[in-house]
Amino acid sequence: AKTDPPIHFASLXRS
């Protein structure tokens, strides 16, 4: 979550 890369957050958004 905190250490997760920006790609992860980007995917969430997309979802």
From Swiss-Prot:
MF terms (GO), sorted A to Z: amygdalin beta-glucosidase activity
Record bears the keyword Hydrolase: yes
Superkingdom of the source species: Eukaryota
EC number: 3.2.1.117
Disulphide connectivity of cysteines: none
Post-translational note: Glycosylated.
Subunit composition and interactions: Monomer.
Name of the protein this chain belongs to: Amygdalin beta-glucosidase I'
